[in-house]
Curated annotation (Swiss-Prot):
Keyword Transmembrane helix: no
Protein name: Heat-inducible transcription repressor HrcA
Cystines in this chain: none
Annotated NCBIfam families: hrcA
Function, in words: Negative regulator of class I heat shock genes (grpE-dnaK-dnaJ and groELS operons). Prevents heat-shock induction of these operons.
InterPro entries per UniProt: GAF-like_dom_sf (IPR029016), HrcA (IPR002571), HrcA_C (IPR021153), WH-like_DNA-bd_sf (IPR036388), WH_DNA-bd_sf (IPR036390), WHTH_HrcA_DNA-bd (IPR005104), WHTH_transcript_rep_HrcA_IDD (IPR023120)
Keyword Isomerase tagged: no
Organism the protein comes from: Shouchella clausii (strain KSM-K16)
Length: 342
């Protein structure tokens, strides 16, 4: 259990180090109005905090910096709520006021807003479309015997599939096909479309559509299940501006991890719990993020948690503000998706 004096000193060191990125000395802390102690007293407390594992002393420096344990204690016990400024509220409101037609645009705009407001890397894990149900299907003929098959899910997720159309297939064939598909497949999970097409619709096509074999083959191509969730990033270069990431090898590992989408999806799914989650340093399972802090929050559609958004930055992070921004945007995203035009 830390004493009141140790709590004040730890709080001051974290605040000063987050702001300056320089080791904090006892003299600079003693000049703060909220610290009524002499430099000598503060030095003693800093030594005790270091011994307890809350502070670290960088080589060739008289000052101290917070350790991972120090940051964790700070986040869990010392943070006070952050009140959004007028500018921050305006930045967040862009998500609910922007004219966005597709769900993917909403996710990308969320990532963009988050990276701009935090100056860190932002990441949004979209919902797993394979579990969604079909709301509508459309086939739009293109030139050169091609067409676009558009699948719209009940959650507003849109998938476009470019397919080859046999020269014998007529516009009236396509129109009858679309009518049958919407009549029989609406409400079907996207993952089951191909199976239902081959079992239930094949005979209907044979009875009602000319050139049904060509159309059946075309639709089989378009209804291959999607690979799963999509990741949306913004601000990947932001970390290069942070002093902690001037090390080329550290940045290389981080960039490599950000390119491994399957690994990131698995990692983010593991954090997809109700509410907000803060991982500091080596608490992150991915080795490339051991020098980072990650703040994530889940978002929902119609009360069901379907995805995660968050920021990746240095452990020297303005936690109070970042937590509020991530939490607020997750709630705004939930509102936007729940009210998505259907």
């Amino acid at each position: 259990m830390l004493t009141e004096r140790q709590l004040l000193v730890l709080h001051a060191i974290v605040d000063d180090y987050v702001r300056s990125a320089e080791p904090v000395g006892s003299r600079s802390i003693s000049k703060r109005e909220d610290i009524p102690y002499s430099p000598a007293t503060i030095r003693n407390e800093m030594a005790d905090l270091e011994e307890l594992g809350f502070l670290e002393k960088p080589h060739s420096s008289a000052g101290r910096v917070p350790s991972q344990q120090g940051y964790r204690y700070y986040v869990d016990h010392l943070l006070s709520p952050h009140r959004l400024t007028v500018a921050e509220r305006a930045g967040l409101s862009r998500l609910t006021t922007a004219r966005l037609q597709a769900m993917e645009e909403v996710f990308q705009e969320s990532a963009r807003i988050l990276s701009e407001m935090t100056s860190y890397v932002s990441i949004v894990l979209g919902p797993e479309s394979i579990n969604e149900r079909l709301r509508h299907i459309q086939i739009i003929p293109m030139s050169n015997q091609k067409a676009v098959v558009i699948l719209v899910s009940e959650n507003g997720h849109v998938e476009n599939r470019l397919v080859q159309v046999d020269e014998n297939v007529t516009p009236s064939d396509l129109e009858r096909t679309v009518n049958l598909l919407n009549e029989r497949l609406v409400g079907t999970p996207l993952s089951s479309l191909q199976r239902k097409l081959n079992t239930e619709l094949a005979q209907l096509f044979k009875a009602h559509i000319n050139n049904y074999e060509h159309i059946l083959h075309m639709l089989q191509q378009s209804m291959v299940p999607a690979s799963g969730e999509k990741l949306f990033f913004s601000g990947k270069t932001n970390l290069m501006e942070q002093p902690e990431f001037q090390d080329v090898e550290k940045m290389r590992l981080l960039y490599k991890a950000l390119e491994e989408e399957n690994l990131l999806q698995k990692w983010l799914r593991a954090q997809q719990t109700d509410g907000l989650h803060v991982s500091i340093g080596q608490e992150n399972e991915l080795e490339a993020f051991e020098s980072c802090s990650v703040i994530t929050a889940s978002y929902a559609i119609d009360g069901r948690h379907v995805g995660t958004l968050g920021v990746i930055g240095p452990t020297r992070m303005e936690y109070k503000r970042m937590i509020k921004v991530v939490d607020s945007l997750s709630k705004d995203l939930t509102k936007r998706l729940t009210g998505f035009e259907r």
